[in-house]
């Protein structure tokens, strides 16, 4: 039924609580108190979440800013720091290997490496791979730490970088590297088994194209699925997400690494390493680098420096350059190499630090 002035009678649900007959005052007070409590709780939760997000964004920005330049990343080791203050390992990370993963690899291998020297990793700049800049970072660290003995570990393509840096250090600064370990390192682009994507990355990089995260994410997932027999599905997902993290190697760095591999010519550095010793370790089951051609090429080109090229990382999974995942496979191999070519002083079980 209508009412005066053309207004319809409101439904019960449209009447405010204050206008409802029979609503006790205690109920109104309870509803008000509940609303007040909810608002305070929601406000505090929202403020806390916003604070955490802001802190995370600030930390991420700081980390990204730090990675605009090449840096040497020391890994603390009480034993090595005390007994070998003048010697250091430098780990040159492989393709798409982050700063965190490089340090993780050193931590995995510390039981073998810390018997000869301290530990440090080379963090590549997210602005792109620049050998001159890496050489500067290394020599500045050498001088600051007063190092006289340098040991290089080339992880996958990092073996190429380690070799060139060693040659440049001797040529420009007169600093000779003691030992270079090549872990599953390709000698040239021809040793890389998957040429299709490799060529495309270099082609686009040289024309100034930079991969967006969405395209890169699809590739990262696809690449690992292809080699799913070497990883669990959990590892596939974790490694793909790591590559899409804000602190992962940038697309620019990855593309420049691809171009470096594509044009690398190891013969340019043969005969330019002085008395440095070299050793190649790898796995015949490697499905990323063609092991047989790579090890033979390195052994021939650096015949004067190569002291070992027959030790295998049998049982490692993935088979290609995986010391972080397989320290129990890698440490005995490194122990054998170092004991043979850099034997520790024999003088009993106690060593005195002077």
Task: Cite the ranges covered by each PLM segment.
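N-terminal secretory signal peptides
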Residues: 1-38
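Catalytic active-site module of serine/aspartate enzymes centered on a nucleophile-bearing elbow/loop
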Residues: 310-354
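Conserved alpha/beta-hydrolase
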Residues: 110-127
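Gly/Ala-rich beta-loop-alpha elbow adjacent to hydrolase catalytic centers
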Residues: 154-162
